[in-house]
Amino acid sequence: MPLMNPLNPWPLESSNPLIAVLVSGGIDSLVAAHLLKQSGADVTAIHFLTGYEPEDRAGRLEKLFTQMDIPVFIFDCRTVFQSNVVDYFTAAYLRGETPNPCMVCNSRIKFGACMDYARSLGADAVATGHYCRTTKDPDGVRLWKGADPAKEQSYFLAFLSQDQLGRARFPLERMTKDQVRAHAARHGLVPIESKESQDVCFIRGEECADFIEAQVPAIPGPGPIEDMTGRLIGTHSGLHRFTVGQRRGINCPAEQPYYVAALDMARNCLKVGFRQDLFVPVCRVAQVNWIPDRPKGSMNVSVKIRYNQTEVPARLTALGETDAVVEFVTPQFAVAPGQGAVFYDGDAVLGGGIIRAE
């Protein structure tokens, strides 16, 4: 009879399952690994190299997990991380979009390349320190918000496939950040990375625009700034330095502040408007990943159009298999192409995709 993992309510394939926990050096993955070990699961740890981490982190991790009697494998995925995350990030900016690399990293790296590597080691599942949870029913695997409203991270996992979700384990699913810290203190677990992970982990100590310039030397330079009527009002320093909704760096005096309304990449033109000009009633979403299935017709949902935003009520209509239209109950400010839009029915994640320009 298959073994039930006490941290998730459905059987694993093996009678003696091996769970690989992805460890970064932070407190969340450290506690996740310890909880799995406490549960009686056979646990191994994987630390993946991106090419953008401190050089001494891998060795320090090995020492840390040796104390917990958990073997650590170092997985070099620098090439695939560069092509799937960093290159995606820079290319999106050069298209005038505002990407969310964490969402892509989770689907292509953590639960993509790393999951493949874990399976090559004989692991049945991959665990992380994300604050979210999954359940399984006859229709498939469902993704839910985590217990801590301030830390829950289901938004970042909305691109995971059914196979990926089925092999994912989230030991912190019903814990708050305070409970995680208390567990670490109670068991003497000291992370090697004290800072909270950032949205763009591969940009350290520099501006986003400077990073993009280093990645893509031949980048378009200054160009015109136009207001909403098409009137020329200034010159920008490079479109890769701006995102929709941004106020800083426009430097065009007016009776009220200007905000970035759109980026016209074909003309190398920055379109700006006043705050009231940036509210939109509807947006189109592409490359939608439905969890577990595409809804039929239209339905009322709550939607999050960026991670650090509260969900807002909207009407969701699926168009074909991977497109959708979101009609906001109240027009929303600065809906940025390239960002992830994630749909919720209460605490359940219905799916998510990429916001596209109208």
Swiss-Prot record:
It comes from Desulfosudis oleivorans (strain DSM 6200 / JCM 39069 / Hxd3) (Desulfococcus oleovorans). This is tRNA-specific 2-thiouridylase MnmA. One of its GO terms (biological process) is tRNA wobble position uridine thiolation. InterPro entries: MnmA-like (IPR004506), MnmA-like_C (IPR046885), MnmA-like_central (IPR046884), MnmA-like_central_sf (IPR023382), Rossmann-like_a/b/a_fold (IPR014729). The record marks 130, 339 as: Interaction with tRNA. ATP binds at residues 22-29, 48, 129. Catalyzes the 2-thiolation of uridine at the wobble position (U34) of tRNA, leading to the formation of s(2)U34. The active site is at 105 (nucleophile), 201 (cysteine persulfide intermediate). Gene3D superfamilies: Adenine nucleotide alpha hydrolases-like domains, HUPs, Translation factors. Its main location: cytoplasm. GO terms for cellular component: cytoplasm. The lineage of its organism: Bacteria, Pseudomonadati, Thermodesulfobacteriota, Desulfobacteria, Desulfobacterales. Belongs to the MnmA/TRMU family. GO terms for molecular function: ATP binding; tRNA binding; tRNA-uridine 2-sulfurtransferase activity.
